[in-house]
UniProtKB/Swiss-Prot annotation:
Annotated S-S bridges: none
Protein name per UniProt: Large ribosomal subunit protein bL20
Domain of life: Bacteria
Role summary: Binds directly to 23S ribosomal RNA and is necessary for the in vitro assembly process of the 50S ribosomal subunit. It is not involved in the protein synthesizing functions of that subunit.
Species lineage: Bacteria, Pseudomonadati, Pseudomonadota, Alphaproteobacteria, Rickettsiales
CDD domains reported in the protein's UniProt record: Ribosomal_L20
Gene: rplT
Amino acid sequence: MTRAKSGKISKNRHKKILKLAKGYRGRANSCFRVAIEKVEKALQYAYRDRRNRKRDFRGLWIQRINAAVREHGLVYSQFMGALKKTEIAIDRKVLAELAVNNSDGFVSIVEKAKAHI
């Protein structure tokens, strides 16, 4: 009986890792031992940064809203407090989009919020 060495299975496993490592520098894209370490680390970074992306975008939206609101003589925290009082339920993502692309709509929201300060 012939000896089974899982040749096809390990070859496919190696191929899968090396495919994921395509584009890496040095031996990381051709040497399995190096590639597997780099791919594992890349997947860890990807997992971590999918969560960080949410934080980063929230910060970006807040910066954009703050910059747009300051042009109208308010501060971000005052504006958001006034929005809550007026019961206007628009999230930060949409507010930032309005501030950048639809300034007329944003100005009308700011005016309504100013009335409740």
